[in-house]
């Protein structure tokens, strides 16, 4: 008679167990490859932090800023570059890894096995989000050493920040999926991804942290996925007693639940579109059910 332990090991895995195992495998593999890729680590972690240091050293004259505002100004600047780093991870590093797998013929093998496209997508996205958090955290950590100041607005602010950050990341990682499919050459995919990141960052005023650089209607900064995500994080991470007198206005702060709901909606739509893309294009299967 089999023992209880043997029975537990011999029990067949359910569909959910298999799906979770596949998700975990893709997450671990993707994160490992991110960390092994020196170029990805440089562009995603070192470059944003260095860009922040260069900016405050050469382009921000703190002698003209009231002493009590210097920490805030550095915090705003760092937050913009932190989200820039997260964007580099979600678009450039994520697309680059997927292009490598497509180019190496791995998907010819994946299509021949019962691999769940959603497990593939969510596993990669979990690794991408984790790496993006590291990139963001490094910039914020470096900024604290330079005198940047932060303050949580409310007890629930960490949860809001996490949701906003993940929704922001989800949108760009799904964009990266379609970039990888459309541009299967790693070199060109990298050039396009970095170009999109840079244009997005600067044309929207450091992802919405410097509205004066944004040429269109400032109200759009509370609607666009990259700027809305950044501004929600800023609202809950910076000690801004009056947004009307700060560099973050106009527009008004994204303080309402509607702004967070819009971000969550962006993330949900991105996941749906990404799932369909993985099924129909990457895995060449039917519609997901």
What spans do the regions from the language model cover?
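Alpha-helical transmembrane segments of multi-pass membrane transporters/translocases
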Residues: 56, 231, 235-289
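Hydrophobic alpha-helical transmembrane segments of membrane proteins
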Residues: 66-97, 164-181, 272-275
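Haloarchaeal acidic low-complexity proteome signature biased toward cell-envelope/secretome components but also
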Residues: 1-42, 50, 64-68, 82, ...
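Hydrophobic alpha-helical transmembrane segments of multi-pass membrane transport/permease proteins
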Residues: 34-63, 75-90, 135, 193-202, ...
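Alpha-helical transmembrane segments and their short interhelical loops
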Residues: 125-193, 198-200, 260, 271-272
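Hydrophobic alpha-helical transmembrane segments of multi-pass membrane transport proteins
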Residues: 74-147
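Short alpha-helical transmembrane interface motifs in multi-pass membrane proteins
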Residues: 10-13, 76, 87-92, 123, ...
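Transmembrane helix segments
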Residues: 54-62, 180-226
